[in-house]
């Protein structure tokens, strides 16, 4: 089984600086990188000097969703801006990520499906996300029909270990 470490770029670099012997796999969030003028076109340049085996691009939909929830109660977050789907598609195409996750729509399985099908038509092999509690057989069959040959399970970030099982 392959494991990918998620976290901010600062966490990644701190971890990599202190654990440089073993190759690592990273999950990089578009929500945190979208404002960067530098496209992640070469993982070797971005992670220069670190032993990064591969990395996956995540849409960051949950980060944006969580920021929107904070904004509703008067708290601010720099990641609360919505994600421009066209920009995400182009960003993913230009990146050197080994895989990318589709732009899921929290609480809207049909919106998630529409986004994924658009990404697939644009040539991305985006990994579909099926959120916790929304896994119907038809949704699983649809996700399996895509080009990624993988399925992600979403909606578990705030679940306990027992709930995730």
Language model: regions and residue ranges:
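Conserved anion-binding
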Residues: 111-134
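Glycine-rich phosphate/ribose-binding loops and adjacent secondary-structure elements
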Residues: 126-165
């Amino acid at each position: 089984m392959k494991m990918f470490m998620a976290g901010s770029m600062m966490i990644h670099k701190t971890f990599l600086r202190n654990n440089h012997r073993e190759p690592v796999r990273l999950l990089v969030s578009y929500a945190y990188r979208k404002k960067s003028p530098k496209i992640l076109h070469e993982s070797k340049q971005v992670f220069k000097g670190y032993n990064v085996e591969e990395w996956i691009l995540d849409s960051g939909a949950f980060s944006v969703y969580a920021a929107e929830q904070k904004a509703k109660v008067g708290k601010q977050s720099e990641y609360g801006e919505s994600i421009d789907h066209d920009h995400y598609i182009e960003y993913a195409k230009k990146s050197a990520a080994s895989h990318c996750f589709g732009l899921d729509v929290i609480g809207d399985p049909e919106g998630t499906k529409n986004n994924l099908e658009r990404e697939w038509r644009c040539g991305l092999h985006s990994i579909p996300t099926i959120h916790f509690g929304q896994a119907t057989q038809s949704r699983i069959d649809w996700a399996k029909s895509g080009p990624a040959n993988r399925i992600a399970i979403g909606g578990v970030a705030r679940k306990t270990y027992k709930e995730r099982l």
